């Protein structure tokens, strides 16, 4: 930060006799300098400044990255153990990056090169960037560091022609120089979109440059390129081949085991930790939630717990003291979080998979299990998709494949181990029955009557159980809702993607309506594409129908046959399932007493004390030393600036009369009028003694010079008027110079340093020159009789010595607290001492005093305040001190009182008023004031109580006192309920709903629930039981 606003002029010189060779050299140096400046911006994110040696230290001076650091800043706390449910992806990344560094001998033995490129694709929030950050941190440990470069797709784009390609070349060049290195392109679809004739030529050139850099004639060496996108179809196909992006990793939505691992990661630092059973149940309800959604659920649950325990913090802006141990996260906090957080997968397109709700789970859970058993016979891959296999464990992902990691011995493929047998088969590609499940065109049709829930409950529950598989929905809204593509094109694209991502599921809900609505072209396209799927490809066709199998069209019947168990008929719930369905509602929820709010009200009324401001972290000795050095550098600039201003004022002939202090021998009455003498030489001395920490302190002394001159020199003769004009000019000149040349930020910095030193208790004169403190001891004898005044910090009144020039800074720091009565006290003592010593000099030098006193600058910046506006206590203290002195020096004090008539009258008037008040309080008036004292004391106590309760009233705005008292005063009556009547109602409901379908049962459940809700606050449940009986009796299933 520069102190003065000075202009810097650059001098350019050129030699006209320079040869062409020198010009070429200058051009080459300029070109090299520009290239280095551009390379300086391409530096890895995971290297700190102190870790880069040599030339890289200079490169860090410009910037660490071209990318925006805010959204892409590297979080060093993210490791591979912070990523859950992606063990296979992490293992593949270790093979690409970590293992070639740790085990180079393996790759050297077989002369192989590990994969140098991979592509992450999948929905948003599934952990693509998180895995990249974890990889960067894992590569930043150990001796062999890996430089990690992170770029977003649009970072390399520029409006200048050829600049984007140049930035890419510089990026790869920098990564090659710092190899091994990783380049991560986030949202690469914005950098390398599909090239076409309709596209802009600039994008095509960028894509061509990126293709050549990744796998061109020049080998890129130990540079791993990782791309991430959620739009795989938007990337140029040339990037998706071996040599560029060798591997493609699908980041799908996490399954149940992966969600549980993610929950464990986000709750592992909680105290106490959630139990494993709760996390498993929570993971089961988080269907369709990505990793970012699960993290948001944990954060929202913590906020719900805080909101429930301390609602007071939402009604005040001050920080309150909280008991963190009383904030506990319960299951209902997670329930509230699940209701608030909507999964990312359901914001754009609703996922077809959905678990059975807690209400219908007792009714349909057995049916779902029977469907899964029937599906396992048709589609054996169900076992892989539903079992809790070991591949979810990060420590053993190799157990996933039985074929690759079996203990079976195979024939040797080397020349030294080959036997002499002929016609030996090495590869057994057709022997897969022992290692993986196999099925022939797996298909399943769930049929039933309308209202059996096959499309609304059963099929989504089955898809939810098979959540490891990718699901492609071919319903009517999907086919006809996309305006840019035809239904035939959308159908063919989905089935092709299903074949590519096998094992997968093609889901066709309401196939009876689907087949009636679509045209013959779409029917032919659908059947043809199904036939093109390989016979043993694990692509399941799942469909639902609300018509019997015999009522379906012949083409649909040909797709599903009875002989292979591809038809599942949904049956009505039996008696046991209906009993479980209504049992919890009728027997438990109906008998639940009203919710008590007394605990919540007490928590809302709890008064929380205001938390003290957080104390700053204590600095170490080294940090304190470094901080003091920086502060002293700033104050050194301040002193240089103030000396410059003072010097400019002193050399001005107009202000020569203010450069030296007044001689007391020539002007004896000066110290009796002016309480704080000040001049420019004293200002210089204070600068040398480090008394000025801000420019405001300096300007106070300039104002002091001006006010002293105006006070001592009355506006009577021309000489005094000239001095008064010059004093005002001195003040205006000083202010103008500082206003013009001082930086406002620098003044603010000085004030912050001054405040920081006060808090730390650091002395402002610690670095002051030591010889200044020796001089006053040699000049102290002339003022030896004023030693008591020095004990009271009144060293100010010796104007001819350096002490008088340096001590005002000590007085200025205490000016607002003590200077008033100290100066008032010293007026009398000064008058006494100087009356004895200078009585004759005052008469002899009266003619010279009018001219010589004008050379002084007379202080007391707030002089009238010390006499007219002093407080009662200050005047009383001053009166006592003056009365003691007057007893000893009656004659001399009377002479001095005549010199200061007006200030004395004012002071005495204040003292007399004080004396009158004190006397009346000590006399008979005390009886008159006794009665009001009691009432006033009560009012004061009430006022204190009101002020103390101010924060409480503000906190209690959350709930009114009347409402709180009404809730707390309510008695808790006993619950009146006949359980036998509830049991009879349950039997009646189960018997009456014998032939009800799923929708009718849900309707009856809603009717009973409404009755319970209406009487939820009643302790007498007799009316509830009667209303439930009436509702069950009057229920008509025809409207369902």
Curated annotation (Swiss-Prot):
Transmembrane segments: none annotated. CDD domains: Bromo_AAA, RecA-like_Yta7-like. Gene3D superfamilies: 1.10.8.60, Bromodomain-like (1.20.920.10), P-loop containing nucleotide triphosphate hydrolases (3.40.50.300). It comes from the Eukaryota. Residues 619-643, 735-761 form a coiled coil. ATP binds at residues 122-129. It is an enzyme of class 3 (hydrolase). GO terms for cellular component: nucleoplasm. Signal peptide: none annotated. Residues 784-797, 849-863, 874-885, 901-919 have a biased composition (Basic and acidic residues). The modification Phosphoserine is found at residues 65, 401, 406, 849, 883, 891, 951. GO terms for molecular function: ATP binding; ATP hydrolysis activity. It catalyses: ATP + H2O = ADP + phosphate + H(+). Residues 629-741 form the Bromo domain. One of its GO terms (biological process) is positive regulation of DNA-templated transcription. Pfam families: AAA, AAA_lid_3, Bromodomain. Keywords: Activator, ATP-binding, Bromodomain, Coiled coil, Hydrolase, Isopeptide bond, Nucleotide-binding, Nucleus, Phosphoprotein, Transcription, Transcription regulation, Ubl conjugation. The keyword Isomerase does not apply. May be a transcriptional coactivator of the nuclear receptor ESR1 required to induce the expression of a subset of estradiol target genes, such as CCND1, MYC and E2F1. May play a role in the recruitment or occupancy of CREBBP at some ESR1 target gene promoters. May be required for histone hyperacetylation. Interacts with ESR1 and NCOA3 and these interactions are enhanced by estradiol. Interacts with acetylated lysine residues on histone H1.4, H2A, H2B and H3 (in vitro). This is ATPase family AAA domain-containing protein 2. It comes from Mus musculus (Mouse). The gene is Atad2.
């Amino acid at each position: 930060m520069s102190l003065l606003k000075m202009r810097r002029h650059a001098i350019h010189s050129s030699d006209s006799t320079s040869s062409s060779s020198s010009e070429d050299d200058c051009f080459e140096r300029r070109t090299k300098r520009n290239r280095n400046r551009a390379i300086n911006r391409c530096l890895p994110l995971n290297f700190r400044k102190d870790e880069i040696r040599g030339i890289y230290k200079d490169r860090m001076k410009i910037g660490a990255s071209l990318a925006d650091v805010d959204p892409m800043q590297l979080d060093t706390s993210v490791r591979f153990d912070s990523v859950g449910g992606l063990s296979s992806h992490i293992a593949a990344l270790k093979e690409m990056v970590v293992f070639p560094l740790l085990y180079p001998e393996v790759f050297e033995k077989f002369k192989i090169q590990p994969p140098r490129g991979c592509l992450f694709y999948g929905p948003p929030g599934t952990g693509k960037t998180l895995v990249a950050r974890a990889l960067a941190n894992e590569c930043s440990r150990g001796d062999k560091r890996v430089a990690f470069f992170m770029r977003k797709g649009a970072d390399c784009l520029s409006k200048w022609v050829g600049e984007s390609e140049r930035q890419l070349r510089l990026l790869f060049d920098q990564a090659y120089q710092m190899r091994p290195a990783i380049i991560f392109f986030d949202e690469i679809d914005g950098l390398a979109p599909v090239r076409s004739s309709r596209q802009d030529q600039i994008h095509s050139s960028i894509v061509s440059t990126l293709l050549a850099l990744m796998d061109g004639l020049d080998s890129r060496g130990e540079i791993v390129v990782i791309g991430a996108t959620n739009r795989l179809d938007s990337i140029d196909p040339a990037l998706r081949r071996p040599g560029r992006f060798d591997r493609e990793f699908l980041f799908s939505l996490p399954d149940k085991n992966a969600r549980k691992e993610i929950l464990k990661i986000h709750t592992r630092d909680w105290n106490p930790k959630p139990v494993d059973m709760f996390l498993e149940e929570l993971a089961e309800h988080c269907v369709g939630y990505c990793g970012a959604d699960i993290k948001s659920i944990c954060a929202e649950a913590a906020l719900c717990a805080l909101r429930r325990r301390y609602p007071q913090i939402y009604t005040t802006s001050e920080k309150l003291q909280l008991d963190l141990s009383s904030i506990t996260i319960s299951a209902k906090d997670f329930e509230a979080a699940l209701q608030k957080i909507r999964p990312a997968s359901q914001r754009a397109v609703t996922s077809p998979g959905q678990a059975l709700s807690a209400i219908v789970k007792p009714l349909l859970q057995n049916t779902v299990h029977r469907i899964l058993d029937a599906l396992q016979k048709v589609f054996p891959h169900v076992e892989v998709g539903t079992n809790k296999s070991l591949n979810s464990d990060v420590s053993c992902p190799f157990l996933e494949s039985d074929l690759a990691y079996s203990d079976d011995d195979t024939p040797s493929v080397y020349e030294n181990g080959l036997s002499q047998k002929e016609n030996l088969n090495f590869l057994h590609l057709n022997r897969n029955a022992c290692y993986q499940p196999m099925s022939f065109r797996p298909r399943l049709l769930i049929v039933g009557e309308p209202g059996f829930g096959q499309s609304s409950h059963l099929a989504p529950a089955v898809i939810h159980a098979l959540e490891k598989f990718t699901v492609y929905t071919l319903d009517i809204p999907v086919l006809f809702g996309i305006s840019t593509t035809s239904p035939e094109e959308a159908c063919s694209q989905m089935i092709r993607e299903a074949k590519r991502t096998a094992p997968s599921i093609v889901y066709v809900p309401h196939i009876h309506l689907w087949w009636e609505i679509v045209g013959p072209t779409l029917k032919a396209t659908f059947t043809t594409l199904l036939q093109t799927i390989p016979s043993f490809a694990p692509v399941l066709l799942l469909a639902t129908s609300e018509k019997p199998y015999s009522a379906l069209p012949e083409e649909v019947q040909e797709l599903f046959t009875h002989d292979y168990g591809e038809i599942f008929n949904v049956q009505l719930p039996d008696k046991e399932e209906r009993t479980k369905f209504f049992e919890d509602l009728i027997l438990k929820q109906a008998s639940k007493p009203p919710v008590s709010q007394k605990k919540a009200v007490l928590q809302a009324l709890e008064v929380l004390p205001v938390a003290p401001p957080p104390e700053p972290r204590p600095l170490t000795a080294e940090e304190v030393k470094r901080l003091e050095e920086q502060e002293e550098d700033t104050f050194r600039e301040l002193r240089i600036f103030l000396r410059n201003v003072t010097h400019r004022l002193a050399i001005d002939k107009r202000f020569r009369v203010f450069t030296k202090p007044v001689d007391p021998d020539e002007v004896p009455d000066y110290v009796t009028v002016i309480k704080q003498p000040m001049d420019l030489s004293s200002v210089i001395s204070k600068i040398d003694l480090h008394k000025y920490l801000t420019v405001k302190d300096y300007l106070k002394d300039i104002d002091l010079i001006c006010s002293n001159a105006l006070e001592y020199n009355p506006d009577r003769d021309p000489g005094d008027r000239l001095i008064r004009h010059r004093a005002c000019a001195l003040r205006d000149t000083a202010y103008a110079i500082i206003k013009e040349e001082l930086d406002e930020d620098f003044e603010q910095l000085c004030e912050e340093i001054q405040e920081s030193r006060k808090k730390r208790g650091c002395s402002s004169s610690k670095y002051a020159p030591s010889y200044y403190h020796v001089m006053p001891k040699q000049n102290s004898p002339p003022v030896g009789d004023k030693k008591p005044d020095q004990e009271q910090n009144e060293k100010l009144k010796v104007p001819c010595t350096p002490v008088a020039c340096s001590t005002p800074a000590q007085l200025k720091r205490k000016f607002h607290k003590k200077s008033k009565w100290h100066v008032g006290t010293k007026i009398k003592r000064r008058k006494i001492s100087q009356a004895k010593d200078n009585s004759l000099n005052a008469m002899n030098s009266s003619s010279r005093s009018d001219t010589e006193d004008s050379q002084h600058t007379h202080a007391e910046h707030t002089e009238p305040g010390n006499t007219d506006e002093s407080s009662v206590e200050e005047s009383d203290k001053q009166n006592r001190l003056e009365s003691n002195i007057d007893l000893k020096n009656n004659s001399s004090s009377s002479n001095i009182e005549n010199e200061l008539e007006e200030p004395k009258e004012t002071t005495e008037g204040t003292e007399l008023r004080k004396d009158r008040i004190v006397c009346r309080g000590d006399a008979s008036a005390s009886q008159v004031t006794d009665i009001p004292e009691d009432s006033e004391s009560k009012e004061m106590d009430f006022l204190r109580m009101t002020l103390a309760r101010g924060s409480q009233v503000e906190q209690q705005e959350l709930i009114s006192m009347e409402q709180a008292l009404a809730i707390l005063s309510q008695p808790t009556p006993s619950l009146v309920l006949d359980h036998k009547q509830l049991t009879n109602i349950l039997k009646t409901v189960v018997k009456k709903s014998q032939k009800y379908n799923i929708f009718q049962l849900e309707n009856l459940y809603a009717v009973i629930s409404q009755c319970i809700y209406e009487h939820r606050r009643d302790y007498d449940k007799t009316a509830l039981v009667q209303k439930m009986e009436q509702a069950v009796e009057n229920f008509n299933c025809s409207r369902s």
